[in-house]
Amino acid sequence: MSSGPIRTLHKGKAARNRTPYDRIAASKDGNHSNGPQTPSKSIFQRAKEWLTPSSWKKAISIFSSPVVNKHEDSFDSKTDEEYLQNVSTTTEDVSMLINTPVTEKYEQEHRDTSAQATPSIVEQSPNQMLANFFSKKGKTPLNEIEKEGIISILNKSASPSSSVISPAASLNRFQTPRAAAISKRESGVSSEPRARTSSLTPGNTPNSAKQWSAFRSTFSPLREQDQLSTISPNSLLPAQRLSYYGPTLSTPYNRRLRHKRHSTTPISLSNSIAPSLSFQPKKARYESANVSFNDTSFTNVPTSSPLHQSTTANHPEKTPSRAAASLLSILDSKEKNTPSITAKAGSPQSAPSKASYISPYARPGITTSRRRHDQIRPSSEKSEPEKKEPSAFETLEKSSNVQTYKPSLMPEFLEKASTHGSFAKQKEGEQTSLSEKTALSEPENKTPVFSFKAPSATTDKPSPPVSSIFSFNAPSAASTKPSPAVSSTFSFNAPTTTPSATSFSIINKEKPARSPNETIDVDLEEEGSGISAEVEVANEGEDLQKNATEVKASTSEKPVFRFEAVTDEKNSEVSSSNQASSSTMISQPNTGFSFGSFNKPAGQEEKPQQRSLFSASFTTQKPELPAAKIEPEVQMTNVAIDQRSFEQAEKSPISVSESTSLVEVEKPSAEGTNEHKQDATMTLEKTDKQGSLEEEPFPKFSFTVLPKENGENLSTMESTQELPKFSFSVLKEEKN
């Protein structure tokens, strides 16, 4: 069994000194001897050495040292023979590793080419190579291969650490036959150097081509370099050995600080496609504390290249420990709960915060269960209180007016009239300047019955006072008697603070006074019909406000009215009597109503503070009536009266109100149309501050005067006595 190439022995002294088992060295002229080539060791010893790595290292050291070139010509010395004997034993073992005809042929060729190798390629720089290439190329155009070769040379020249590996340096390293053949083929191509020569250096430019697969199995022994984590994807360094497919698959080595990687399990793939349909992965216990934890980092699908790493790991945010995180969460929950409790202390249902239900030992990526969260949510959401629908009784009260009076209240008013007489007596001292006594004609035996109807007030333009709408209805009387001329005044007093449903407005409408000798033209209507009037009342001046508050009911929101009548002395002129003496006023708080009367005695004169202005118009049939008796201070013209008239009432004092108002009265005919309108004005003398007299019109109405409490001027009334029916409505403000 031959273990090496056939060698010819040199005839001489050296050949005689060798034993038959020594390695035969080659002669100087290259001829080989035909002696025996018995191996010095047995087969078992050589097999044992072949399996041990120590023999490999010895063979590498032999091939790396220049043995052949140094001792090829020195065969005469004894030291050379001993050296060759030692080498022969080593090469005999190594020859078992390379025991193929291809390797034997390759070794012979390698010796021939190594002697002929020149260092011209090694010494040339990229600039020299390009200069030589373009000097040979001249003006001929470049093809695609030449362009790529030039670009690769320029890229090498740009990187300072890139250099061409010399063939001499490759001889000093141990190479397998296949690797040596590859390096021989690469060294033969000088015009197109491969970019792989600089693949071990990390300073390549991004323009270099990618020449590796997605997951190369190359191994990089440089563990101490931390630049591998920040390498750009376009670099030519070998792939970093990290576990991309979980801890089950083995890799050449694993880093101690691991990152969670995407897994190819169906659950992980479903997370990447639809993260909301699955649970988030839990944080690993072995994960380092200096790596930031992000829930969205597990839902990213990895790319084909393993070098695409997130650059956020360069400056990781240090997360606190679990004990510190639990303390911070407890403090944060207390701070969030404190303002919500203080703000909602009065409310019975205070929404608890979500932080109070989270465990302080919970991990950052783990939330509460859906079932528990659904139980918390209804308590945190406070339902708005539903608006209570008003009942039918409330809507009826709102739709109807507050100032609605029924005839059933009138007997109660008559029964309790005497109890409120003391209230009118207390006001006598305040109205002494307006006291005045006149004789009233005795009224007819009719009981005054009033009914009030209050439709909704409609005012087009706002005004400082407020006006109210009232209708007074009374049953018709069977018999009517024309009454003589009676000087009576009719006025309304409104309180300073009126109910919200009522409104009063001021209309100053001055009308010329009629002549004293003018007769009264009255239209009468069929029996049972009422008289409709539109009333607007306004308060004017501080005195009016003072008098209005006196007659205002304490707790009732109903409007307060005061009816006054001025009676004259029988068959006597009262031209100089302008002072009115106030008397007791009978009022009823339940109805907000007050009646009064006053007499005007002769010889007394006093300046009234204010008078009421009324303008009345009636539409009735026109029977002729005797002319009214005209007094100097009171003038009545065209006053429409109903078919029911009253006899002159007894003398009884009443209180005079101070207000300025305008009354317009309209009465429709039986056919439903207004046939005729007549204005009736009654003027009263009014003294200003200098003593001058001013006339203001007043309407004249006949009505029944109630008796006083002390029994003076009492008039007996029966339950069958009736009063005329009046209807009042709101009059819109007129602007002159």
UniProtKB/Swiss-Prot annotation:
Region (Disordered): 1-46, 178-210, 295-321, 338-519, 565-614, 647-701
Compositionally biased tracts (Basic and acidic residues): 19-31, 375-397, 664-692
InterPro entries attached to this UniProt entry: Nup60
Record has Phosphoprotein as a keyword: yes
Keywords annotated in UniProt: Membrane, mRNA transport, Nuclear pore complex, Nucleus, Phosphoprotein, Protein transport, Translocation, Transport
Chain intervals with Low complexity compositional bias: 474-505, 573-587
GO biological process, one term: intracellular mRNA localization
Main subcellular location: nucleus
GO cellular-component term (any): nuclear membrane
Entry's Gene Ontology molecular function annotations: structural constituent of nuclear pore
Compositionally biased region (Polar residues): 32-43, 196-210, 295-314, 456-473, 588-597
UniProt modified residues of type Phosphoserine: 157, 159, 161-162
Its membrane topology: Peripheral membrane protein
Localization (cell): Nucleus, Nuclear pore complex; Nucleus membrane
Function text: Functions as a component of the nuclear pore complex (NPC). NPC components, collectively referred to as nucleoporins (NUPs), can play the role of both NPC structural components and of docking or interaction partners for transiently associated nuclear transport factors. Active directional transport is assured by both, a Phe-Gly (FG) repeat affinity gradient for these transport factors across the NPC and a transport cofactor concentration gradient across the nuclear envelope.
Assembly, per entry: Component of the nuclear pore complex (NPC). NPC constitutes the exclusive means of nucleocytoplasmic transport. NPCs allow the passive diffusion of ions and small molecules and the active, nuclear transport receptor-mediated bidirectional transport of macromolecules such as proteins, RNAs, ribonucleoparticles (RNPs), and ribosomal subunits across the nuclear envelope.
Official protein name in the record: Nucleoporin nup60
Organism whose genome encodes this protein: Schizosaccharomyces pombe (strain 972 / ATCC 24843) (Fission yeast)
